[in-house]
A protein has these predicted regions:
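Short flexible/disordered coil segments
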Residues: 180-189, 206-220, 261-275
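A conserved mid-domain beta-alpha-beta active-site/ligand-binding segment of alpha/beta enzyme cores
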Residues: 199-256
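Long hydrophobic alpha-helical segments typical of transmembrane helices together
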Residues: 241-279
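Sterically constrained small-residue positions within well-ordered secondary structures
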Residues: 16, 73, 235-238, 264
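Generic hydrophobic, helix-prone segments enriched in Leu/Val/Ile
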Residues: 98, 223-224, 273
Length: 279
C-alpha cells in the first residue's frame, strides 16, 4: 500500500494500482457517521456500503441505540447497500458479533449473490412498523475486498481502540476523521455543509423539550454553544447530553421525512419516530 499525505494531518492509503480506497462506513444514522460518509466521498473513495449495529437491548457502551434504522433510509437515499447487524448491547459479545459479520464481507467473494433481502435478513433489520421500506434498499453482499472501515468516533478511546483492534484482526485499515475535532466548529461545519441534524433525545440540564425534533440551524448551534457554556455540557453531545439523527446530507440524493411523538419526563426526553419515508 502507498501512503499519501492529505496535507491535513491525515494519511490516506491507496492500492498500488491507484484505484480508490474501497471502504465501509459504520453508520448509526446520526451526525458523526453522516460526516464520516461525507468525508469519505470527498476523498474520492468508493463507499461500498453502510454498516449499522442494531442494538436490540436498552443500552450499549459502544453503539447508538435510538433511531438507527434511519441509516437504512440514508443508504437507500444515497443508493448504497446496507448491512444491519443485530446485537443485544452486551459489551462481552457485541464486538465479536460485529467482527464476525464483517469478516464475511471485507475479504470479498467471487460468488455473485442477489442484493434482495431474505426473510431472515429482514428480521435482522428490525425495520420499524410504520416506516416505508425504500424499494431500492439493497442488502450489502461480499463482492470486491474492502480496504478500510470509517468511523465517526470523536473522543471515545474505548470505542476507537476496540474498533482499531477489530480492524487489525480483519486486515483492514481504520479511519476516524473526526478524532478530537473541536466541538463548536464541528457542529457549525455540519450545518453549513448541508447536514440536516435533528435531536432525537436530550438528557442534560439546559436542554428542554423544545429541542426535541428540531432541525438545527446556525442560530441553534450558537444557542447550543451558549447553553453548553452556562450548563457545562459538551456542545457536540459527546458526553451523552443528546443523540441525533440526520434526515438530509450532501451525500444523500433524497431527504427523509419523519413523523414523531415527543416524550418528556421533566428532566430528559426523546422522540419516538413512528413514520419515515424518502421524499
Amino acid at each position: 500500500m502507498e501512503v499519501l499525505n492529505t496535507g491535513g494531518g491525515d494519511s490516506i492509503d491507496r492500492c498500488p494500482t491507484q484505484r480508490p480506497m474501497r471502504v465501509l462506513v459504520l453508520a448509526s444514522g446520526g451526525k458523526d457517521s453522516s460526516y464520516a460518509t461525507w468525508w469519505s466521498t470527498l476523498r474520492g473513495w468508493d463507499v461500498a456500503g453502510l454498516v449499522t449495529v442494531r442494538v436490540t437491548g436498552e443500552d450499549s457502551m459502544m453503539f447508538q441505540v435510538p433511531s438507527t434504522a434511519l441509516a437504512g433510509m440514508q443508504a437507500a437515499s444515497a443508493d448504497l447497500p446496507w448491512l444491519p447487524i443485530p446485537i443485544e448491547g452486551d459489551d462481552r459479545t457485541e464486538m465479536r458479533i460485529l467482527e464476525e459479520a464483517l469478516e464475511g464481507i471485507v475479504h470479498g467473494s467471487h460468488k455473485s449473490r442477489s442484493p434482495i433481502w431474505s426473510s431472515a435478513e429482514l428480521l435482522d433489520a428490525a425495520w420499524p412498523e410504520g416506516w416505508v421500506w425504500p424499494s431500492n434498499l439493497r442488502r450489502l453482499r461480499a463482492s470486491e475486498p474492502i480496504d478500510a472501515l470509517v468511523v465517526g468516533a470523536i473522543r471515545s478511546d474505548y470505542q476507537k481502540t476496540r474498533i482499531e483492534q477489530m480492524c487489525e484482526r480483519l486486515g483492514v485499515k481504520s479511519f476516524t476523521p473526526l478524532w478530537h475535532h473541536e466541538g463548536r466548529s464541528h457542529m457549525h461545519d455540519l450545518v453549513s455543509q448541508g447536514h440536516q441534524v435533528i435531536l432525537t433525545s436530550v438528557s442534560t440540564e439546559g436542554l428542554g423539550k423544545e429541542w426535541l425534533g428540531r432541525i438545527l440551524s446556525q442560530h441553534d448551534v450558537e444557542e447550543l454553544e451558549s447553553l453548553a457554556e452556562v450548563h457545562r455540557f459538551n456542545i457536540d453531545g459527546e458526553g451523552g447530553e443528546f443523540e441525533t439523527a440526520v434526515i438530509d446530507a450532501p451525500w444523500m440524493k433524497y431527504s427523509i421525512n419523519t413523523q414523531h411523538t415527543v416524550h418528556w419526563t421533566g428532566r430528559r426526553g426523546w422522540i419516538d419516530i413512528w413514520g419515515a419515508e424518502l421524499v
